[in-house]
From Swiss-Prot:
It is an enzyme of class 2 (transferase). HAMAP family: OTCase. Gene3D superfamilies: Aspartate/ornithine carbamoyltransferase (3.40.50.1370). It comes from Halorhodospira halophila (strain DSM 244 / SL1) (Ectothiorhodospira halophila (strain DSM 244 / SL1)). Transmembrane segments: none annotated. It is found in: Cytoplasm. This is Ornithine carbamoyltransferase. Keywords: Amino-acid biosynthesis, Arginine biosynthesis, Cytoplasm, Transferase. It holds the Pfam family OTCace. The keyword Chloroplast does not apply. The gene is argF. L-ornithine binds at residues 160, 217, 221-222. NCBIfam families: orni_carb_tr, PRK00779.1. It catalyses: carbamoyl phosphate + L-ornithine = L-citrulline + phosphate + H(+). Its EC number is 2.1.3.3.
Amino acid sequence: MRHFLTLRDCSVDEIHQLLRRATELRDMHRAGHLHQPLQGRVLGMVFEKSSTRTRVSFEAGMAQLGGHALFLSPRDTQLGRGEPVEDTARVVSRMVDAVMIRTFGHDMLERFAGHSAAPVINGLSDLCHPCQLLADLQTFTEHRGPITDRRVAWIGDGNNMCHSWIEAAGLLGFDLHIAAPPGYRPEADILALGGDRVQVFDDAYAAAEGADLVTTDVWASMGQESEQAAREEAFRGFCVTESLMECAGEQALFMHCLPAHRGEEVEAAVLEGPQSVVWDEAENRLHAQKALLEFLMLGY
């Protein structure tokens, strides 16, 4: 049984295969070509955290592939009334062909996958966000070619998105420069996944210099609202500005997994500027996940 809980659940060759297939599926969709290999298949979607892009991309993706997506929330299921995750996994996975879970604790994903008869996909956890990384890697490849031996600058919180970038650097062989204030950096065991490809910087400009891609995320994620003021103070100097993009160079792309807070982690002029590919990046969630659904349900 194959699951997709982290990028490391796929080999390097499989990641490249998924990226190629994602671009093929995007091109087919834009050309109006009907491709429905998942007729009769059902994706169960468990949302403990609300979402726009994750829900729309998985629901639309299943519909475009000929299947159906079933939305489940703790409020509407026995999960919200204390049923053990293991029991829910045993039951739901016998009725659907795959399960996507967007949750807070990564351990919930692991417990569910450990008792599931169907593939489980990490739609986001507090540890990592591998589906977003597939879309980001697809977007970079489409605009700049292979990411191997390139340089990526992560500016801001060493959060789940940063963790997945660290995994990707170790797997795919590109340099990752992380600029984050003390207290908000990835733990040593996470950094170790990137090996000598990852460096941590105190200064955002030093991290961004010569980067092929500059990327960031919100300073306070869902569930961290009470920390907003403290985080705004800690992350002063870690905003992606026009001057920081100039430091990176005209070749640098800008990405953000969204939603973005203009004027906090990124200036509006950067988000809307010529180096920004965030809207392609957002669309590619749809196509990268369609490739993943094919891979897990059909084996290709």
